[in-house]
């Protein structure tokens, strides 16, 4: 996803 903690890696 977008901006998070673990979500940040899969922009």
Curated annotation (Swiss-Prot):
Top-level taxonomic group: Eukaryota
Keyword Glycosyltransferase: no
GO cellular component: extracellular region
Keyword list, A-Z: Amidation, Neuropeptide, Secreted
Leucine amide: residues bearing it: 11
Localization per Swiss-Prot or TrEMBL: Secreted
BP term (GO), one: neuropeptide signaling pathway
Similarity comment: family membership: Belongs to the FARP (FMRF amide related peptide) family.
Protein task: FMRFamides and FMRFamide-like peptides are neuropeptides.
Protein's name in the database: Extended FMRFamide-9
């Amino acid at each position: 996803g977008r901006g998070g903690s673990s979500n940040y890696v899969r922009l």
